[in-house]
């Protein structure tokens, strides 16, 4: 009887262990803020247009698709970001999910990107400008999964690679805004 109970306990433990290791990736989150030496309205005027990402140094051009599509209609406005690159035409396609000009905020999601360009899947983010003692505080936060959805991802598609890539994008954008407006320490 004792052997049978030990066997059942061992089998149950092994089943639980294999289930725990087979859960797949966890949603990652990146949230960054910067306070700029400008009014919130001045900064929103630069970054609040879904059809214009020219303020970000990685973006060569922004194209609304299809041509003539609305620029500020949630679930309809779609942009294609053409990225600066030495070869090829890497792109990221994003759809507007929500926009609130009064709150100086919009939410968007990536609908198409090659993991070689950005090693993430199911990415959505919010970009918002708030007033902080008369200065502009910019919040950029996103949630996403790594580029490889299964267990044992290659190094370039793991959680660390996804977080590093998104952090680098946000930081490059913030650095460009700080250069343009000045950063409040």
Named regions from a protein language model:
Residues 133, 137-139, 143-185:
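A conserved amphipathic terminal alpha-helix motif
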Residues 26, 118-124:
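Amphipathic hydrophobic-ligand
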Residues 35, 64-118, 172, 176-185:
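Glycine-rich portal/gate segments that line the openings of hydrophobic small-molecule binding cavities
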Residues 20-72:
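Hydrophobic ligand-binding cavity/cleft-lining segments
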Residues 42-47, 53, 79, 96, ...:
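Hydrophobic pocket/interface hotspot
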Residues 1-5:
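Positively charged n-region of N-terminal signal peptides that target proteins for export
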Residues 98, 127-133:
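Short, low-complexity Ser/Thr-rich regulatory SLiMs
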Residues 7-15:
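Bacterial N-terminal signal peptides
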